[in-house]
Design a protein with these regions (language model features):
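Charged catalytic cores and adjacent phosphate/nucleic-acid-binding surfaces used
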Residues: 1-8, 12-30, 34-36, 47-90, ...
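Conserved Rossmann-like nucleotide-binding pocket used by diverse enzymes
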Residues: 40
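Active-site gating loops and adjacent loop-to-helix segments of metal-dependent hydrolytic enzymes
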Residues: 83-125, 168-169
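Alpha-helix-centered segments that form part of catalytic cores
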Residues: 111-146
Length: 241
């Protein structure tokens, strides 16, 4: 077994609420400097900056996962993670069919920049990314897991778009294995208040949208097996394998 530090929820300049300077290479570099072993890029309802993130992460010696912070029909955020960019892109193709396409108003919401590993802008998403899809909680979970990914509720300890904030409690279904916390200090108080969380394992995501939101030092670690890359071991851990 080995100890790995993780941060499995981060945004880039593709999310309109993310700072333009949050290019994938910077996200990767900041996590490497912080001592994180495995980091995931999880922009709102898209995975299109994951290739640049993977290229930069591998250059820096960071082990990456590809992901998406999907907004369900209930307006709840769930994190969907994949081992490869190709799997994540295939998932996004399916999610796109469930997006509600509203033109992005850059002057109000911000830019949605697709960039390469050299920080060059290669495109933009013209439609506002964070709004709710037509996928329900269960449909999003079923889609992600059927395509080889994992899915868990994002920032259950946050008042905005969190599972508990929206529903008032943790539902029986989907049968999530993990719950993501934004602040590890909230884990025990939330488990005390919401009994179903006691049956779920905990994972951490900084939900960083700007450089100074990435912790300067890694704050959350897990024990995983010794096989393969750190990202591969973390992914097996998330899948319960």
């Amino acid at each position: 077994m080995r100890t790995v530090f993780v941060d499995l929820h981060n945004h880039s300049c593709l999310s309109p609420c993310g700072e333009d300077e949050m290019v994938p290479a910077l996200v990767a570099g900041l996590h490497k400097l912080a001592g994180v072993d495995v980091a995931a890029l999880t922009d709102h309802n898209t995975t299109r900056n994951c290739p640049a993130f993977f290229e930069a992460a591998q250059a820096y010696g960071l082990s990456p996962l590809a992901g998406m912070e999907l907004t369900t029909a209930e307006d709840i955020h769930v994190v969907c993670l994949f081992l490869t960019c190709e799997e994540a892109a295939a998932f996004e193709e399916n999610v796109y069919e469930h997006r509600v396409l509203i033109k992005n108003k850059v002057n109000i919401f911000g830019n949605q920049l697709i960039v390469d590993a050299n920080d060059q802008v290669i495109g933009e998403d013209p439609y506002y990314l964070p709004n709710a899809t037509t996928l329900t909680l269960e449909e999003a979970y079923d889609l992600a897991t059927s395509m080889g990914g994992v899915c868990h509720p994002a920032h259950v300890d946050r008042p905005s778009n969190g599972l508990i904030a929206v529903l008032g409690d943790v539902p029986e279904h989907p049968a999530y294995r993990f719950a993501e916390f934004n602040d590890p200090a909230n884990i025990e108080p939330y488990r005390e208040k919401y009994p179903r969380l006691r049956d779920m394992q905990v994972i951490y995501g900084s939900d960083a949208h700007r450089p100074d939101a990435v912790p300067e030092e890694a704050v959350f670690s897990i024990e995983v097996d010794d096989e393969g890359t750190p990202a591969e071991a973390v992914f097996r851990y998330l899948k319960g394998e």
